[in-house]
């Protein structure tokens, strides 16, 4: 798959759309939670975080008083800024995640090209980058310091399930286990992330021993060993995705 055809496959000289694994997992969006985060960001845009103590209203009062001194056009802009604060936050987080993936991918490619896939640790290309150090800190307890990187940012597809995806990292441990790793620029790995890695496991002919989610702002990586259960759950999710998609 070429980059411009990331979720497509060439059949009879025609590009056919595949189903993106991340798109399947997105149907599990918790809308009540999303609404909470959206309204929280709006209030933060007005100087108040609901997570703060109830008496911590000075910033809110100051911001409201400031807005009241503006003309109607400026007031509208200020309120729109608060209204769209969550969208801007999400966009900034996505950009940050992309930057982290680029750093880790460059480092992983260097490991493959210059060190037979073994981890480059300190004093070498990008190895001293905070994101690389954080990855090593969280991942090594689960895969070992002698693990070997097989592939990074691996674009793959399953013609049987009509799926496509990009796997962050695939490694082989010293005792021969094949592991899928996924990075997230946040403090925790959620169940949705495990399901996403379960989807990736369909893209490779070699059996996957376990998956490992690595939260680059967290304290612990999250492994999952029952890959067959993840695959079973993901297939159910894929069925639901196809059902819902027919109404679009």
Which residues does each PLM region occupy?
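Metal-dependent nuclease catalytic cores that hydrolyze phosphodiester bonds in DNA/RNA
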Residues: 1-163
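Nucleic-acid nuclease catalytic cores
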Residues: 130-131, 154-248
């Amino acid at each position: 798959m070429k980059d411009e055809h990331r979720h497509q496959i060439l059949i009879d000289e025609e590009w056919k759309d595949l189903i993106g694994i991340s798109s399947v997992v997105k149907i599990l969006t918790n809308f009540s939670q999303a609404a909470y985060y959206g309204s929280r960001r709006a209030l933060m845009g007005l100087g108040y975080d609901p997570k703060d103590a109830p008496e911590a209203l000075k910033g809110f009062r100051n911001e409201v008083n400031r807005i009241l001194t503006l003309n109607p056009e400026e007031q509208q802009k200020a309120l729109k800024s608060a209204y769209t604060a969550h969208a801007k936050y999400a966009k900034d987080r996505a950009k940050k995640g992309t930057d982290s993936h680029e750093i880790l991918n460059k480092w992983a490619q260097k490991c493959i090209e210059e060190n037979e896939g073994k981890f480059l640790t300190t004093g070498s290309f990008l190895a001293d980058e905070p994101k690389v150090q954080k990855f090593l800190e969280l991942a090594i307890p689960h895969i070992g310091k002698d693990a070997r990187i097989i592939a990074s940012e691996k674009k793959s597809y399953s013609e049987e399930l009509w799926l496509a995806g990009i796997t962050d990292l695939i490694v082989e441990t010293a005792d021969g286990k094949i592991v899928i790793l996924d990075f997230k620029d946040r403090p925790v790995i959620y169940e949705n992330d495990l399901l996403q890695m379960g989807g990736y496991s369909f893209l490779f002919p070699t059996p996957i021993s376990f998956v490992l989610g690595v939260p680059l702002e967290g304290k612990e990586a999250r492994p999952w060993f029952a890959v067959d259960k993840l695959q079973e759950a993901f297939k159910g999710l894929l069925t639901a995705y196809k059902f819902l998609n027919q109404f679009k």
